[in-house]
Amino acid sequence: VKEMNTDFRKQLSQKKKPLEYIDVDKREDFPPVPNGMRYIHFYGGTKNYRAYIAPEDISRADFMEQYPEYVPEHNKPVYENNGIIVRADPKYPCPGFYIFGLNKTYRAFDLLDDTTFLRYSFILKKTKEGMRKELGINYAHLLSNEKSDPFVNVHFWLVPVEGTTSPDLLDFNVKEYLSSFKPEEQLDKILLYNKKLKEYLKRIDLVKQDNELTAKLIGMKNKCYSKVENDEAER
C-alpha cells in the first residue's frame, strides 16, 4: 500500500502545473483574486508576503500537503506524526507562534475521536515545555478556531506572550498583537526558534512517546469494549 501511495503521489506531482504567485509588502496590497481561485499566502518571498493563486476549493491545510514545495522553510513542520502537525503559523511572523493542525478535516474539536484529542493535548503540553525550556517563552495563550467554512480545519494555536506575566485573554487584542510583527525583522528568529524546538522534540523522542500513548489509549478502549461485551453476555 505504501508503494502504491508513493507511486500515486509521484504521478500527482508530475501532473501538477506550477502555480503563479504574487509578492506584496502588505496583505491589503493583494489585487482581487481571479474567478474560481483563491490566495494561499505566507509571509516571506521577495517582499513581505507571497500569495499562491490556487483553486478556490482547496483548503490551506490541503494546499500544504499537496504542494509542499511551495511551503517556505520557516513554515515546515517542527513535529509531524500520525496525523498531527506542528509548525510556525504561516500567516503571522510572530516568533514562537505555533499552530497545531490535522491532516484529516474536522469542523470542531468535539468531533475528534477521543484518542486524537488526548494526543493533541499531550503534544500541546510537550511543545509548550520546549517553548519554555528552549525558547524562554514562559506564557502563551491557547486558542482554538472553529468555522462553518468548509475549507477550514479545526486547529489550535499557542500564542506567545512577552514578559513574565500574561495579560488576560479577554483584554488581549490577538490580531493587533500578531500584526505588529514584520516578516523582514523576524524571519531569522523564527528559523532559530523552529530549529531549537524541533531539536528539543526530537531529543525527548516525542514521536516515541506519542506512539506509546496512542497504543495505551487504544488498549484501554479495547479493554473497555471487551468488558461491556462480557457484561452483556452474562446478563
Q: How would you describe each model-predicted region?
A:
Residues 98-123, 175-186:
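Short histidine-centered catalytic/ligand-binding loop motif
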Residues 139-141, 184-209:
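A short, terminal or domain-edge coil/loop segment
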